[in-house]
Amino acid sequence: MIRSELIQKIADENPHLYQRDVERIVNTVFEEVTNAMSRGDRVELRGFGAFSVKKRDARVGRNPRTGETVHVEEKHVPFFKTGKLLRDRLNGKEE
């Protein structure tokens, strides 16, 4: 599912809301999650999961094509840990 499909689905299930308002809400949610994570904050959505930022240390890597060793800089990467309700639903354990 892509962002436009999510917006359409929410708008279809909430006919009292205009699609442009739903789009604004969805965009705001994504923007706030992005802002929080860029500050290093953890974003937890109970039952769904938690978004956080993990630090990957600098390391020596290898170019798979040439075999040459290369220095890989330290970086921060997004991390998502699923919540129990989401995990259960994915594994067919719906309540």
Curated annotation (Swiss-Prot):
A Pfam match: Bac_DNA_binding
List the record's Gene Ontology CC terms alphabetically: chromosome; cytosol
PROSITE patterns for this protein: HISTONE_LIKE
Which Gene Ontology biological process is one annotated for this entry? regulation of translation
Q: Which UniProt keywords apply?
A: DNA recombination, DNA-binding, Transcription, Transcription regulation, Translation regulation
User: What InterPro entries has UniProt attached to this entry?
Assistant: Hist_DNA-bd, Histone-like_DNA-bd_CS, IHF-like_DNA-bd_dom_sf, IHF_beta
| Stored CDD domains | IHF_B
The record, for SMART domains, names:
BHL
| GO terms assigned for molecular function | DNA binding; structural constituent of chromatin
**Purpose of the protein:** This protein is one of the two subunits of integration host factor, a specific DNA-binding protein that functions in genetic recombination as well as in transcriptional and translational control.
Q: Which family does it belong to?
A: Belongs to the bacterial histone-like protein family.
Q: Which HAMAP family match?
A: IHF_beta
List the PANTHER family hit by this protein, alphabetically: DNA-BINDING PROTEIN HU, INTEGRATION HOST FACTOR SUBUNIT BETA
How does the record describe its quaternary structure? Heterodimer of an alpha and a beta chain.
Q: Can you name this protein?
A: Integration host factor subunit beta
Please tell me the species this chain comes from. Answer: Ruegeria sp. (strain TM1040) (Silicibacter sp.)
